[in-house]
Design a protein with these regions (language model features):
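Membrane-embedded helix-loop-helix hairpins and adjacent transmembrane boundary segments
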Residues: 1-527
Length: 527
């Protein structure tokens, strides 16, 4: 059979499996909290697979190999350091977030922050800020469309419709249970492909001299491709750009679509095992980008030609190396990466509407006399309808951004929130002295600094009179590097949070004692 025929065969099987899991997950939904968090329902191994799959996105199969194809060995820093940053961030933060979130009965990261700082306004502010993740979800849908077009020969409208419809069916049915169950299965498939790619590169498959032959070939094409830093890209052009990779990703695992999975872990005693396994799986998935090095050896600079694209590096490598049926599996791998990130975004976004806005804000004012059972039923219904609304909105956004480079827009959402969360969420998990005003200040300052630097709106000539034109020129040069911008935003967020907290009214001691003593007891019990 042809590549298209095999791709269709695998697609039908994949869609059937995802929908089947959604139907099964629906049976596990007893109330709204099940839909939102699947609290305490999964062990560390399966949840680690699901978490690692959600952390990876369509870029893991397309963008990361493309960077290795274009920039060579300097990109290994990214593949290795970003998973380390993510899981170190989880390790230092999850003690308080998981323990307190379970005690409060939180269903979202915005709700957790509202309870952590005893502020409805904080919850609403973070909820509204989280809406920028719609751009991230739209970007995932676009990645799915690209894969359908390449592997199945579909036009954009059909590709977008199928991607959104599959997501809609299984998430509406099973909520967080469907999210985690499908992500665990998809994570296992992605991990198998990652191990295959790592072995291919390590052995230098089909290249004389093995891995050393890959390095020699890259050096012959361009010596910069084997240098530890690459001056041709702002992502890896200096040791600063390498340093920021791990630190930029520290808050990533606590963004709303990932952080809510921490509450699905079955027991606090499994936390360290969960983090170790998720880090191991995440590191393996990160190494998928190495496939771009082998693709550069096989194809040279052919993917720069008209009609080609470096994003095709890994799919074309599979087509080159393997039988048609096996090459078609890369399409399922990319689709798994897209769906495993997108479904978490859909669930967390629906909870902004159903939980953070309706249950915690509107319902107490509009329906104060509702019983808990009636309220729960309404929240569950709103969760499902919100899922439909979120997907429709993001599909429209994806359609409008189809011919646009969405990386800047996506990173305004992801990088901006990572910068914003560094103070109130990460520092707030380590230091009991963070105040409400400190959290507000850190949240807004980190987000604002990221946007200002990443959008490159500052002009050096504006600052010649005060002698800062050189510093501003450097900041402007760092603008295209989202990791550098995120770290600078995170530094500002943490610094402002600390300074303002030192100068403002602390939270009640009884509240802090309950938060941190319980987290410490939980850690002690798990050791």
């Amino acid at each position: 059979m042809s590549l298209t025929a095999w791709s269709w065969t695998f697609l039908v099987g994949y869609v059937g499996l995802m929908v089947g899991i959604g139907v099964y997950a629906k049976q596990r939904i007893k109330h709204a909290d099940d839909f939102a968090t699947a609290r305490g329902a999964y062990g560390p191994v399966f949840l680690a697979l699901a978490f690692a799959a959600s952390t990876a996105s369509g870029a893991t199969f397309l963008g990361s190999p493309a960077m290795s194809y274009e920039w060579g060995l300097s990109t290994v820093w990214l593949h290795f350091l970003y998973p380390i940053g993510v899981y170190v961030g989880i390790l230092i933060s999850m003690r308080l977030v998981a323990t307190s979130g379970n005690r409060f009965g939180n269903r979202s990261i915005p709700e957790y922050l509202g309870d952590r700082y005893q502020s409805d306004a904080m919850r609403l502010m973070v909820s509204l800020l989280s809406l920028v993740l719609f751009f991230y979800l739209a970007g995932q849908l676009v990645s799915g469309v690209v894969m359908f077009e390449i592997m199945l020969g579909l036009d954009s409208s059909w590709a977008l419709g199928i991607t959104a419809l599959v997501l809609l069916v299984y998430v509406v049915l099973g909520g967080a249970h469907a999210d985690i169950l499908t992500d665990g299965v998809q994570g296992a498939m992605m991990l198998a492909l990652a191990i295959l790619v790592i072995c291919l590169v390590a052995l230098g498959w089909g290249v004389d001299g093995g891995f050393a032959g890959i390095v020699d070939d890259l050096e012959q094409q361009d010596p910069v491709l084997v240098a530890p830093i690459n001056p041709n890209t702002s992502l890896f052009h200096s040791w600063w750009s390498i340093f920021v990779i791990a630190f930029a990703h520290l808050p990533l695992g606590l963004l709303p679509h990932l952080g809510n999975k921490l509450w699905a872990l079955d027991t606090s005693k499994s936390r360290f095992q969960f983090v170790k396994l998720a880090a191991l799986f995440g590191l393996a998935l990160g190494m998928l980008g190495l496939g771009g090095l082998l693709a550069r050896v096989y194809f040279g600079d052919a993917l720069y030609a008209d009609g080609a694209n470096p994003n095709q590096a890994l799919p074309l490598l599979f087509i080159e190396l393997f039988p048609t049926w096996l090459a078609a599996l890369i399409g399922v791998g990319v689709l798994s990466a897209v769906m495993s990130t997108a479904d978490g975004l859909v669930v967390s976004s629906s909870q902004i509407i159903a939980n953070d806005i309706y249950r915690r804000t509107l319902a107490p004012k509009m329906h104060p006399n509702l019983s808990q059972q009636e309220l729960d039923g309404r929240v569950l219904s709103i969760s499902r309808w919100s899922t439909v609304g979120v997907l429709v909105i993001c599909a429209v956004m994806a359609w409008s951004l189809m011919d646009v480079n969405v990386s800047l827009v996506v990173w305004i959402g992801v990088g901006g929130m990572m910068a914003a969360f560094a103070g109130p969420l990460v520092l707030g998990a380590l230091w009991r002295g963070v105040t409400l005003k400190g959290a507000y200040s850190g949240l807004l300052s980190g987000f604002t600094v990221f946007i200002i630097i990443h959008s490159q709106i500052l002009e050096p000539e504006w600052f010649i009179g005060v002698g800062l034109d050189g510093a501003v020129a450097w900041l402007r040069g760092e603008g295209p590097n989202p990791y550098s911008c995120a770290v600078m935003g995170e530094i500002v967020s943490v610094s402002v949070t600390f300074i303002v907290s030192k100068l403002t009214q602390p939270l009640p001691e009884a509240h802090l004692q309950a938060l941190f003593s319980e987290a410490q007891q939980s850690t002690g019990g798990a050791s």
